[in-house]
Amino acid sequence: MDKLADLNYTLSVITLMNDTLHSIIQDPGMAYFTYIASVLTVLFTLHKASIPTMKIALKTSKCSYKVIKYCIVTIINTLLRLAGYKEQVTTKDEIEQQMDRIVKEMRRQLEMIDKLTTREIEQVELLKSIHDNLITRSVDVIDMSKEFNQKNIKTLDEWESGRNPYEPSEVTASM
């Protein structure tokens, strides 16, 4: 286990792989050498990272199937990202979690729509009652005794000087 996580051991294996590749491929003009070396380096790094992680996870976890499935899905997603794909591989558990989240969000939106619909119905009923109260009813005789502007009306006899103060008078101006 110590040998798997040792940095010097990892670097020596990478150096050994590079030396082996250089000795196999003597042609300096080979165009695909860098790509082959990159892929082999990535595969080796995945191997070095996944094996100890999986061993530790299997020892500490009670459900080894889920751990192995999760590790394999993670490795496949990493390889897909390295290849340039945007898609990801998902497990059924992740799909079920996403579906539960979507269903929960749909329920929340339906409850909100129901609340809004109830409020709109209440507003329409309120507007109808306001409209019913505002409808003018025809009255034969209008009682003016309660009107604001009719309380202080004085007749011509009740005025002090006997003339209407609101009536315009003639004004002469000197020139």
Curated annotation (Swiss-Prot):
Q: How does it sit in the membrane?
A: Single-pass type III membrane protein
What does the entry list as the binding residues for Ca(2+)? E120, Q123
Residue ranges in the Lumenal topological domain are 1-28
Q: GO annotations under biological process?
A: monoatomic ion transmembrane transport; symbiont-mediated activation of host autophagy; viral process
> How is it modified post-translationally?
The N-glycosyl content is primarily Man(9)GlcNAc, with a small amount of Man(8)GlcNAc.
Chain's role: Plays an essential role in the virus replication cycle by acting as a viroporin. Creates a pore in the host endoplasmic reticulum and as a consequence releases Ca(2+) in the cytoplasm of infected cell. In turn, high levels of cytoplasmic calcium trigger membrane trafficking and transport of viral ER-associated proteins to viroplasms, sites of viral genome replication and immature particle assembly. The secreted form acts as an enterotoxin that causes phospholipase C-dependent elevation of the intracellular calcium concentration in host intestinal mucosa cells. Increased concentration of intracellular calcium disrupts the cytoskeleton and the tight junctions, raising the paracellular permeability. Potentiates chloride ion secretion through a calcium ion-dependent signaling pathway, inducing age-dependent diarrhea.
What HAMAP family does the database record attribute to this sequence? ROTA_NSP4
| Family assignment from sequence similarity | Belongs to the rotavirus NSP4 family.
* Protein name as annotated: Non-structural glycoprotein 4
Give the organism the record lists.
Rotavirus A (strain RVA/Human/Japan/KU/1995/G1P1A[8])
